[in-house]
Amino acid sequence: NEVKFRGITQINRLILFGGEPFLNTQLFEYIIKEFSKFTTILKIETVTNGTVLNNNVKKIIDNFQPYLTISLDGPEFIHYKLRGKGSHRKTTKFIHYLKTINYTNFEIASTYTRLHQLHSLSRDDIFQYFTNMDVHFNINDVFSKNKVLVVKEMEKSLVDRKKFITDSINNIVENNEKAFISPILYDVLISMIYKSTNHTFCDDIDPSNTITFDVDGSKKLCFRFWGTHNSSKAELFNNKEYFQQCKDCWCKGMCLECVANIIDGYSSVINEDGQFIECHKPELMEYCIKEIIYLSQDQSKISKLVNNFKRFIRYA
């Protein structure tokens, strides 16, 4: 009723979360059909653990072709420690099913934690694990204040991050579309190729772009604020003009930063009190641009970078 009242006739992305959304396929289907009565839905997305695979789930996949983000944290033993015994087998079975029906509309989301480090699993090990699986994937450090989970020395060195950018450019040029590319390069290319400008840190919490509903029907800023978790600081912290360093920054139009991470104290750029810490994005974005300029000396390679990039645009 809220969406209908606002006169919305097109939904660019309908994103359905859980818990585990596929535990209630009837509700999943009901929401889509109700919205379809008065809107055009361009894309349906969901985040799943991939632990439920029955005829109802298969029907959902077949009928609605949702973009699936599947949670898998690495090899069997580490995934079991994080998500429970038996979960890895179910999730890999789910992925195998998608491959057997040639369903390519999915990616793996992996969370890198301190437990990975304690069991001698580096990010490169996890990267190689998913590369060997031949799937689209992304790897993110855990957001947690639990010292058992939080990654020691979470930030890569600037040298490593620059190498990651160079490797990412090569992967795009070579069309290795299942490779995970640098988020910094991603933001730069989105801005340069599609001529977009990010006026705020996060468009997802802008009510003119996005409406988020909790399970009880109440409106929230984004899914990170479901339940009782909310903050009056969100609108303030989403304003780049509020921070002097950001206000005067040459690359602020390309910059994205998760406001929920800032509020929850997980951002390495701005703390939960709104105090600026440090930011290496200007240096890294400048490096991206220099690498792109260098690449432009080869017309074939720069054309491949621009034309292939659309295949690397992911759920975020």
Residue ranges and their predicted role:
Residues 1-16, 24-142:
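Radical SAM/AdoMet-radical enzyme domain recognition
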Residues 10-12, 207, 245:
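Exposed loop/turn and edge beta-strand positions of beta-sandwich/beta-sheet ligand-binding modules
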Residues 25, 222-223:
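Short linear motifs in exposed loops
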Residues 25, 55-57, 79, 117-119, ...:
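Generic domain-boundary/flexible-linker signal
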Residues 55, 221-222:
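Short capping micro-motif at the N-terminus of alpha-helices
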Residues 77-220:
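Radical SAM enzyme [4Fe-4S]-AdoMet core and its adjacent flexible, acidic
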Residues 218, 224-316:
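Flexible mid-to-C-terminal extensions adjoining Fe-S/redox cofactors in radical SAM and related proteins
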